[in-house]
């Protein structure tokens, strides 16, 4: 805060949180040879997160929020940040080395819907789409969700967002899809016979 890397109204995670979220780090190498590192979103990521948002095309934002957002304000991010506890609600970011520094190029989140169900959502920068990044994120989020008592994911997806529907279909063979106007509600029960080691995304 003294160096203004985070705002005065941002509170850092408690020390016990910082200890266990270290286990939530992972990496992957894309088919194009790019190394992506994944970790939980932190308050100090605000500027990078906002830069990520403004780097996205309108269609990508619309697919995520179902309406167009022109401004991504400090207050909007604080509202999102206030719900993150790294257990019932969490956001993971993917970072890639760009022009000498790391940039956020993806974010995946889950939020509590009920005691056993968490709603999941993703955004991936256009030049990093179709590289398996959302699939890696959902695998990592499932590991964390299982550790915190969840038994399934849900998602609301626009009917023409075929790429996201493919990600869910590929991972969850027993997923159910319910069409409601322009949206599809997806329910994705976790397979009960899998171990955490089986579903853990690859790490370097």
Region roles according to the model:
Residues 1-204:
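Long, contiguous binding/interaction regions
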């Amino acid at each position: 805060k003294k160096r203004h890397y985070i705002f005065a109204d941002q509170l850092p995670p408690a020390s016990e949180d910082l200890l266990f979220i270290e286990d939530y780090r992972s990496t992957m190498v894309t088919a194009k040879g790019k190394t992506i590192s994944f970790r939980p979103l932190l308050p100090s990521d605000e500027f990078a997160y906002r830069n990520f948002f403004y780097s996205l095309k309108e269609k990508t934002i619309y697919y995520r929020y179902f309406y167009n957002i022109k401004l991504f304000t400090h207050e909007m991010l604080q509202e999102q940040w206030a719900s993150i506890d790294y257990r019932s609600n969490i956001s993971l970011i993917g970072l890639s080395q760009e022009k000498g520094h790391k940039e956020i190029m993806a974010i995946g989140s889950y939020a509590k819907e009920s005691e056993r169900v968490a709603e999941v959502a993703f955004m991936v920068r256009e030049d990093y789409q179709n590289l398996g990044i959302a699939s890696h994120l959902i695998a990592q989020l499932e590991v964390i969700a299982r550790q915190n008592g969840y038994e399934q994911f849900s998602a609301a997806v626009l009917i023409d967002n075929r790429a996201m529907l493919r990600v869910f279909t590929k991972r969850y063979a027993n997923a159910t899809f319910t069409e409601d106007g322009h949206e599809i509600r997806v329910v994705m029960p976790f397979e009960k016979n899998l171990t955490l080691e089986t579903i853990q995304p690859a790490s370097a």
